[in-house]
A protein has these predicted regions:
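Short acidic (Asp/Glu) patches
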Residues: 75-80, 108-111, 115
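Short, basic, glycine/proline-bearing loop/turn elements
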Residues: 96-102
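Short hydrophobic targeting helices and cationic amphipathic motifs
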Residues: 4-6, 11
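Short His-Asn-centered micro-motif
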Residues: 95-96, 129
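Class I SAM-dependent methyltransferase SAM-binding "motif I" and its flanking Rossmann-like core
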Residues: 103-105, 112-121, 125-149
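Short amphipathic alpha-helical segments
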Residues: 28-29, 59-60, 104-107, 139-141
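N-terminal beta1-alpha1 cap of cysteine-dependent amidohydrolase-like domains
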Residues: 12-95
Length: 149
């Protein structure tokens, strides 16, 4: 029989939310207790705004910051080296919007593997809502988003 200390334990801190709004609540307010609990004592996060196509990335980041004032949030789009920003992030937040645009941007910027590495190997907390949760699966083939980039 295998000893527990010989096994590889695989634990990821992932919070997937179906939506940013529930029951006419303000943006992220229904999920806020779960988000803060998931982050525990973490007070900084990198926000991936690439699913947002109807607002600027700066505006989207500001919207998330306003909804979560307890956390200092920096948009990934502001970093000179987004790969390193993901690897160094205390937590990763990925917003909703267009799943196909989000995935396209992550592929173009070569961020999929670094996000996986951060979450799997560094145990970095990940929180995604809507499109940000859709990309957690093995494929986005089952999303009901329009396939428009």
């Amino acid at each position: 029989s295998e000893n527990l200390d010989q096994r590889v334990l695989f634990f990821m801190q992932i919070l997937m939310l179906s939506s940013s709004r529930v029951n006419n609540c303000e943006y992220l307010q229904d999920a806020k207790p779960a988000i803060l609990d998931h982050l525990h004592l973490i007070t900084e996060a990198v926000f991936v705004p690439y699913a947002g196509i109807s607002v600027s990335y700066d505006s989207y980041t500001q919207q998330v910051q306003a909804a979560l004032p307890e956390i200092s949030i920096t948009g990934l789009h502001t970093y000179a080296d987004p790969v390193q920003a993901i690897l160094d992030a205390p937590a990763i937040l990925v917003g909703g919007g267009n799943t196909f645009h989000l995935l396209h941007q992550l592929q173009q910027l070569q961020l999929i593997a670094p996000i996986q590495q951060a979450v799997r190997e560094h145990n970095t907390p990940y929180i995604g809502w809507s499109a940000g949760s859709n990309i957690c699966g093995a494929t986005i083939r089952t999303t009901n988003d329009m396939p428009i980039i």
